């Protein structure tokens, strides 16, 4: 089991991490191009330094037309109709109970009793699921994979799956699209685009971007040849469903055929047919909502986390699921191996990384998830003291988010900061991983930014063929792209010494997406038996749920 005591010391203060070479992280005094041996392999990406000053905080005022008219007293039934549309049942009962005329006394009394009963039921439901009492903004901030979502200028970052293009959601609710081959930066704005929580590019499409907003989902269709920097709102398609707000997570199927959405207040995952603007629910009756969705790269499974101490894994053939309860808290973050045979996840309140394997392969038309009985602990991130050139430094704690690169050889973990501890800022841990023939997790190093900068989001480039490319959003507004140069263990394609890409094996393609899927040796015991071996296990037992 890997622990923080095995990590090399962090870089000296004032140094920033530039790239990885020979399994070591190279630092410098500032963000600069790699040495001459590497400059030929450097990809052309825009350098972003976004500050909070020019970004206006999104307004929270009501921009409706109600305040433009002179107030006059309406009849009670008209007021109830308007309140039903704006507030719902609670507002109607409150209006009738507090009306002074036009209502019989027994109607007022009955409405008062019904209002008290509804409030009691609401408080009971809120005690079971405390997150339902939060405002929409607080809900998004609570379950966002970015640290300090409420006040950071970089809220969401999403790479395009096939090209050097990415989208960034900013504090002012605008979304900017950057392309390495173009100087034009479209800025997407819409009156419904508020509190953006997730961005998702449609696979196998050059121009379709899904945006998760407070009240809906916007599907932007951008013309790659357009010279406009402000696409009109007519380029956006609106998807919405009652009770499915705020939307906190989006996930396209790897084939691009389906779009999944999740909301912490809706117990059902919504599967959207974008062309007809209709959705089909994937319901369950426990968990109080869905916070995050993550489709496995092979398209066979979907991880669905909840606000409660349970998470589910769905299979995408017959749409059945299995559930794994956790011991202390909800699933905080997770990531899939490239072949979908392994899930790494963390639990809120625990400084541990768990591994859950899926050795069973189901045939065509058979609905089964095939997960192991229990999860094993593969890394202990408990706080420890590390000797540095500047003295002792405490490192460790809980993980906030975690990403696995498409080659399956690098894992980045964004650790939570501790405001009460001196220098208790968030840090990024980098691991070397191997998923076949046996799973390995080894320390690589600690990624550091400019003085005073704290990491807020991390993600890997989906198709970087020279190793891995880690993109980091910092609290200063800078988006840094850190290349991790290494030779792929299964299909060596890049040699930093030669400075050129090597040819893949016969029959293999030049892209990661064209390579055969990794495989794992499955045990000879029953499918539900835990994998053999001495690692400690915790009882995360699945229970079938259709």
UniProtKB/Swiss-Prot annotation:
Keyword Cytoplasm: yes
Motif Microbody targeting signal boundaries: 544-546
Phosphoserine sites (modified residues): 33, 495, 511, 522, 525, 541
Region called Disordered, residue ranges: 500-546
A GO term from the CC aspect: centrosome
Keywords: Acetylation, Cytoplasm, Cytoskeleton, Disease variant, mRNA transport, Nuclear pore complex, Nucleus, Phosphoprotein, Protein transport, Repeat, Translocation, Transport, WD repeat
Quaternary organization: Interacts with NDC1, the interaction is required for nuclear pore localization. Interacts with the inactive form aurora kinase AURKA. Interacts with PGRMC2.
Protein purpose: Plays a role in the normal development of the peripheral and central nervous system. Required for the correct localization of aurora kinase AURKA and the microtubule minus end-binding protein NUMA1 as well as a subset of AURKA targets which ensures proper spindle formation and timely chromosome alignment.
Name of the protein described by the UniProt record: Aladin
Gene responsible for this protein: AAAS
């Amino acid at each position: 089991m890997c622990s923080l005591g095995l990590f090399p010391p962090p870089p000296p203060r004032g140094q920033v991490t530039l790239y990885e070479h020979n399994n070591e992280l190279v630092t410098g005094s500032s963000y600069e191009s790699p040495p001459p041996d590497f400059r030929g392999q450097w990809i052309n990406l825009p350098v972003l330094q976004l500050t909070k000053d020019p970004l206006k905080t999104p307004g929270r005022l009501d921009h409706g037309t109600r305040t433009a008219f002179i107030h006059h007293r309406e009849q009670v039934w008209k007021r109830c109709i308007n309140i039903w549309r704006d507030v719902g049942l609670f507002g109607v009962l409150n209006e009738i109970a507090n009306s002074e005329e036009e209502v019989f006394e027994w109607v007022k009394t009955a409405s008062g009793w019904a209002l008290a009963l509804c409030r009691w039921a609401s408080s009971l439901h809120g005690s079971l699921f405390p997150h339902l009492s939060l405002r929409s903004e607080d809900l998004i901030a609570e379950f966002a994979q970015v640290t300090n979502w409420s006040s950071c200028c970089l809220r969401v970052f999403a790479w395009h799956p096939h090209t050097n293009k990415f989208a960034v959601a900013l504090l002012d609710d605008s979304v900017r699209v950057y392309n390495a081959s173009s100087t034009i930066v479209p800025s997407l704005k819409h009156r419904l685009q508020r509190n953006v929580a997730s961005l998702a590019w449609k696979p196998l499409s050059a121009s379709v971007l899904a945006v998760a907003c407070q009240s809906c989902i916007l599907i932007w269709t951008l013309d790659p040849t357009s010279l406009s920097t402000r696409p009109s709102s007519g380029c956006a398609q609106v998807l919405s469903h009652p009770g499915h707000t705020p939307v906190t997570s989006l996930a396209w199927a790897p084939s691009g055929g389906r779009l999944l959405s999740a909301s912490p207040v809706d117990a059902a995952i919504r599967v959207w047919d974008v062309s007809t603007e209709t959705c089909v629910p994937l319901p369950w009756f426990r968990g109080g909502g869905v916070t995050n969705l993550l489709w496995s790269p092979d398209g066979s499974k979907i991880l669905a986390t909840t606000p409660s101490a349970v998470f589910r894994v769905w299979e995408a053939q017959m749409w059945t699921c299995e559930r794994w309860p956790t011991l202390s808290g909800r699933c905080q973050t997770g990531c899939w191996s490239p072949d979908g045979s392994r899930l790494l996840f963390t639990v809120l309140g625990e400084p541990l990384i768990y591994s859950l394997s899926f050795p069973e392969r189901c045939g065509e038309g058979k609905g089964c998830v095939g997960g192991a009985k229990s999860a094993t602990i593969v890394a202990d991130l408990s706080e420890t003291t590390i000797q540095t050139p500047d003295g002792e430094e405490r490192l460790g704690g809980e993980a906030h988010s975690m990403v696995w690169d498409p080659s399956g050889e690098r894992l980045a973990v964004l650790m939570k900061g501790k405001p009460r501890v001196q220098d208790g800022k968030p840090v990024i841990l980098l691991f070397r991983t191997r998923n076949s023939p046996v799973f390995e997790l080894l320390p690589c190093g600690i990624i550091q930014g400019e003085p005073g900068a704290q990491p807020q989001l991390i993600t890997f480039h989906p198709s970087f063929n020279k190793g891995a490319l880690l993109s980091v959003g910092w609290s200063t507004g800078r988006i840094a792209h850190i290349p991790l140069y290494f030779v792929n263990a299964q299909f060596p394609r890049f040699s930093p010494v030669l400075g050129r890409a090597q040819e893949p094996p016969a029959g293999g393609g030049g892209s990661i997406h064209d390579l055969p899927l990794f495989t794992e040796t499955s045990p000879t015991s029953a499918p539900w038996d835990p994998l053999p071996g001495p690692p400690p296990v915790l009882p995360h037992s699945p229970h079938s749920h259709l």
